[in-house]
Amino acid sequence: MPHTFIDLFAGCGGLSLGIEQAGFTAVFFNEIMPVYASTYLKNREIPQGHYFIGDINDLNKQLDNYRSIWETIDGGIDLVCGGPPCQGFSMANRQRVIDDPRNNLYKAYLFFLRAVRPKFFIMENVKGMAQRIDEIKDNFREYMGDDYAFGYRILRAQDFGVPQNRERLIFIGNRLGIEPNDIFARIEAKKRLGFVLRDALEGLPQLEARPEKNKSELEDIRYGLTERDFDYPRTAFYQFINGDRVITKLYNHKNRYNNPRDLEIFRRLPQGGNSLHESISDIMPYGRRNSIFKDKYFKLREDEICKTITSHMKFDCNMYIHPWEARGLSPREAARIQTFPDDYVIYGAQNSWYAQVGNAVPVKLAEAIGASIMEFLA
């Protein structure tokens, strides 16, 4: 019998994919954004009706319509995972987080956990959530009682091979009597030597910046294609994200429009250079402003890990300038930095590709967490 899991706030599927690579099988997911759900569905087999596209609060009102999915599984659901958006946990003021209306989604996640009662759960979030740990413990006990033991750690994606500076707060709980510290010890044991940005970018076709606005839907090999045949170099990083599979298509490797001034900035900046660098002082549009604009432009260093991939890339990639080409990173390059395999296709408009990838959990971080939990179920 396969080990089963449910993903809430599933996004385009980064957390799910890592859990699947650890050996679990998805039986249900929830995502509010239809285009994210489309990407999730088109990259895996999910039975019709085994998902809810909409607000989790609406799902919780209709749980009786879905209970048969998990109640007919021998032994019940093994794992529920998810990352509820909780902007309130990043607030600088001292207002109690439990009173912040933006945290209703967090409570909805706990409501679902109480209804399904999985053997394990994973909740990932911004590391600022750790500052409110006392309230969080109270909320867990309010919803879950004393049946679940849970703990938390701030994990760095780079420690698990991800070529990116990304820290996430990971909560793990279980009702099997397992000490949470033992689970995190298994996760820590999976740390490995990592990769740098060059490893994720090398071997992909060169692109030019698109010179025309509002033409991202056009297909032109100079600026990149939604899909093309491609013979990937079999590098160590290729093996890391793809395993032994032979992939012959390149997806989502398209560049976006940049104005002539930005392109000149991209060309002049050295690797590691930002908005305050002297090489662009005569054309820098924020030159008269203070240092808060220093990262408006940033050329990435190929010999270091990448800065955190975020959904801001849907607006521009000026903070993610390619280290040796005068352009921003492509969505496929961002996906590689998030350790998505090369045949994981992102659907929707190009700006949405960036947002979906930027909001995802790094796949190989998720796999390390999932594999550690699997060791207690095997």
Predicted features and spans:
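Acidic-residue sensor for enzyme active/binding pockets
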Residues: 31, 124, 333
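Class I S-adenosyl-L-methionine
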Residues: 65-74, 87, 91-285
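Short Gly/aromatic-enriched secondary-structure transition segments
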Residues: 43, 186-190, 323-327
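Core alpha/beta nucleotide-donor-binding catalytic domains of modification enzymes
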Residues: 2-117, 127-131, 138-140
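C-terminal target-recognition/interaction regions appended to catalytic cores
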Residues: 227-378
